[in-house]
Amino acid sequence: MAEARRFSPVHELDVGQILSEARHRWLRPPEICEILQNYQRFQISTEPPTTPSSGSVFMFDRKVLRYFRKDGHNWRKKKDGKTVKEAHERLKAGSVDVLHCYYAHGQDNENFQRRSYWLLQEELSHIVFVHYLEVKGSRVSTSFNRMQRTEDAARSPQETGDALTSEHDGYASCSFNQNDHSNHSQTTDSASVNGFHSPELEDAESAYNQHGSSTAYSHQELQQPATGGNLTGFDPYYQISLTPRDSYQKELRTIPVTDSSIMVDKSKTINSPGVTNGLKNRKSIDSQTWEEILGNCGSGVEALPLQPNSEHEVLDQILESSFTMQDFASLQESMVKSQNQELNSGLTSDRTVWFQGQDMELNAISNLASNEKAPYLSTMKQHLLHGALGEEGLKKMDSFNRWMSKELGDVGVIADANESFTQSSSRTYWEEVESEDGSNGHNSRRDMDGYVMSPSLSKEQLFSINDFSPSWAYVGCEVVVFVTGKFLKTREETEIGEWSCMFGQTEVPADVISNGILQCVAPMHEAGRVPFYVTCSNRLACSEVREFEYKVAESQVFDREADDESTIDILEARFVKLLCSKSENTSPVSGNDSDLSQLSEKISLLLFENDDQLDQMLMNEISQENMKNNLLQEFLKESLHSWLLQKIAEGGKGPSVLDEGGQGVLHFAASLGYNWALEPTIIAGVSVDFRDVNGWTALHWAAFFGRERIIGSLIALGAAPGTLTDPNPDFPSGSTPSDLAYANGHKGIAGYLSEYALRAHVSLLSLNDKNAETVEMAPSPSSSSLTDSLTAVRNATQAAARIHQVFRAQSFQKKQLKEFGDKKLGMSEERALSMLAPKTHKSGRAHSDDSVQAAAIRIQNKFRGYKGRKDYLITRQRIIKIQAHVRGYQFRKNYRKIIWSVGVLEKVILRWRRKGAGLRGFKSEALVEKMQDGTEKEEDDDFFKQGRKQTEDRLQKALARVKSMVQYPEARDQYRRLLNVVNDIQESKVEKALENSEATCFDDDDDLIDIEALLEDDDTLMLPMSSSLWTS
């Protein structure tokens, strides 16, 4: 049934057809959305219109034209008499809010209205669609006018015949499909589009075609059957027949038939069998007079198989004729039978049946007109008023119409009907909200599939939300939300009640800061949209359900796009200024000092390794920006070479100096990405971990700016990855290079530095046991990024576990030393650390030991859970306080006895017996010294405990960053690139070492060859001498 109540979706809307229909009716939300989303196809007005007429539509840009409402018309004002009184409503397409709508009523002409629409979507919210239209009154007043015309028509048969002719002309051009009626007959008539009442023309249009509209129903409407209802013998859908059709038939004739979804396709209708004869008969009937029609009338109405359109026609003719109760009963029975037959058969009858039933319809009209008994006409009027426009009929009018009638003082009979038949507007509105949830159950579940549970509604609505700000918040942040609306209860009940707001499944208290304004704090939540509504601190929605969005915020120290460029430019300028600075006492490097000359040669060799780089730049075509960068680096190389030689010759600190801002050459090179400046500066005597004025090393600067190549070079040169900067407000205990990289979004660099710091910390531990497991080093370069990151997680986890194991062993050793009070009884450091290595087990007990160890780890993890640990600490603290109170009481109680006994002994023995001074001259300096020694030891222990706690926190943070690196593909790729950089640097070092060794080998081979040549020369010289001697 829920699927049957849903309207068919909007297919393709013809914007031209929509604009042509806008001259005579209000547009629906899907149509307005189509226009606003295609605003590029229309001309946007740059000036406000001057007294636009009814049916005018305009489009404005709110950012360009702010005062587009100044149109020259006199609109209804608020109580102050200055501000235009506009009502606001959010319109829906389906079940989603899509539009803002503002209504204004004319002061002089109350039927003249202005409606302004714009989308809720932020990208298109600046485009405004304004529609001016003069409505023709309300349903109730229209029905009374119809009654008056019916009485006049009963007295004037000629006018009735003319009206009948116009009726037939209207149906010839404005007939609706049978398939459309099959959907509408199962729903109730609703002229509201998301909470605003439409005039008569909109009622007619929405009754025939309700594609894409979002309609709210009450519980009575959902439970009402398709046939029958409160109007005995009539389908509730045909309450629209009470509106005068002669007013809008003329307007509908101007609309093209082929493009309208409510029109009959004339080409298909004419080609249908039996339709041609029907049209010919209709033309002949139109040309006849009323007397000829009455003369050609046939038998009665009892056997008339009425179709929906003929039923609509006959209902109007009933009002224009007199009839008997028997005829009315038979007509009622035939209508019910015809509707049941249509519903059971699926309404598959052809349009031909409609035309074939026209002759029978005319016969029924003539039969009713021949029985002129007018006394029953007033009875029919009362039946229609109390049935079609009674309590059930008025309940179908939406809440916004009643609110408009009450607040704006709408004129006409509709206001009186609302006041007489509606006891509580909020109660009826809430029933409609509940019925909307019930009728669109599948749709609502589909729209709210992101929520854990759909909001629960209370019995009545107590608060109406107009707007709330802000409508979103960042994840992990709490913001103050202001909700503006209207209390639907009295002031006393509002002040007594406890209000709250629901954000998803979290309820937070709300404060009433003014009449209709609530204030609450949005709780922290995951990213996404959650339902937002007001409750009475019972988790039940007592207001409309809106959406609140949580967005993800990128955590960065500053804006990378704007501030990085300016910071880099400033650092470059400071670097050039430092290199260009010359000291007063400049002495060149003397050639006598061999060490300085060798150092100068090494620096020159490293800086000018590629002398042909300028020639390559001239030969190859490169961009102008790259040319400038290369020329700047060549200039900086020359300046750095002369500056390093100058500082080496001066002696003292040498190159380990800082500029006016507190940074040195190594820091500038690391931050700017000048890899060629690192090794010469370090060879010149600057430490790799040389700190600036804030305690930052070169590795800190490289990690801060994300210099992957620089980080690999510094790690290869021996930089310490775990050094801490000076404390600052952002990092009270100092920050590591990993902290700076993570704060700037370089998660891959942070993961690599964290892993490297853990492995470096393990390598510092003096584990002398040969059976100790070794932590795996960096993975092979042929593996994938995911494999490398998983290997890093495994290495970091193993390193952190072993470090914690060492800490526990050391703390256990100190406890033993304190317990026995003798250092000889305690274990040595080497023995304590060697006990950490896993012992060799027998093959038979290995499996059982592993299972026992795994069980112990599970128990420890469960005990170390956050909540359990917190509860344990709270309970322990309470127990310690109780114990302290008890011990203090006991100590004071015993202390009094001791003081009394000591006082007696001191007076009796020391003073009276020995005639001495007693304890009055007693000095406790030795005791004080012992106590001071104990406090110093305790302070040292506290210091070590605090330091170890901070180290453990850093280890946990480093391990968490390595694990989080696996979740982000970009971080894994960055980690992979950094591994490749380190591997390339190591390979280049190995190749250089091999080249140097081969060069030395070649030199040794040359020396051997020379010795052999000398030996050969000696042999050639000795041979003639020996021969001469032999001959002699």
Swiss-Prot record:
Biased composition regions of type Polar residues, renumbered to the chain: 174-195
Tissue: Expressed in roots, stems, leaves, carpels, and siliques, but not in stigmas or other parts of the flower.
Region (Disordered): 146-197
Inducers of expression: By heat shock, UVB, salt, wounding, ethylene and methyl jasmonate. Induced by infection with the fungal pathogen Golovinomyces cichoracearum (powdery mildew) and the bacterial pathogen Pseudomonas syringae pv tomato strain DC3000.
GO cellular component terms, A-Z: nucleus
GO molecular function: calmodulin binding; DNA-binding transcription factor activity; sequence-specific DNA binding
Residues the record lists as Phosphoserine modifications: S272, S964
Renumbered residue ranges of the record's region Calmodulin-binding: 900-922
Protein modification: Ubiquinated during pathogen infection. Ubiquitination leads to its subsequent proteasome-dependent degradation, thus allowing the establishment of plant defense response.
Principal subcellular localisation of the protein: nucleus
Top-level taxon: Eukaryota
Keyword Repressor: yes
Phenotype seen when the gene is deleted: No visible phenotype under normal growth conditions, but the double mutants camta1 and camta3 are impaired in freezing tolerance. No visible phenotype under normal growth conditions, but the double mutants camt1 and camt3 exhibit semi-dwarf phenotypes. No visible phenotype under normal growth conditions, but the double mutants camt2 and camt3 exhibit dwarf phenotypes. Reduced growth, chlorosis, spontaneous lesions and constitutive expression of defense-related genes when grown under 22 degrees Celsius. Enhanced sensitivity to insect herbivores.
Coiled-coil residue windows: 945-987
Any Gene Ontology biological process: defense response to fungus
Localization, UniProt: Nucleus
ANK repeats: 661-690, 694-723, 733-762
Keywords, ordered alphabetically: Activator, ANK repeat, Calcium, Calmodulin-binding, Coiled coil, DNA-binding, Nucleus, Phosphoprotein, Plant defense, Repeat, Repressor, Stress response, Transcription, Transcription regulation, Ubl conjugation
Domain IQ residues, every copy: 852-881, 875-904
DNA-binding region: 15-141
SUBUNIT field: Interacts with SR1IP1. Interacts with DSC1.
Function field: Transcription activator that binds to the DNA consensus sequence 5'-[ACG]CGCG[GTC]-3'. Binds calmodulin in a calcium-dependent manner in vitro. Regulates transcriptional activity in response to calcium signals. Involved in freezing tolerance in association with CAMTA1 and CAMTA2. Required for the cold-induced expression of DREB1B/CBF1, DREB1C/CBF2, ZAT12 and GOLS3. Involved in response to cold. Contributes together with CAMTA5 to the positive regulation of the cold-induced expression of DREB1A/CBF3, DREB1B/CBF1 and DREB1C/CBF2.
Family, similarity comment: Belongs to the CAMTA family.
Miscellaneous comment as given in the Swiss-Prot or TrEMBL entry: The camta3-3D activation tagging mutant plants exhibit compromised systemic acquired resistance (SAR) and enhanced susceptibility to virulent pathogens.
Protein name (Swiss-Prot/TrEMBL): Calmodulin-binding transcription activator 3
The organism of origin for this protein: Arabidopsis thaliana (Mouse-ear cress)
Gene name as annotated: CAMTA3
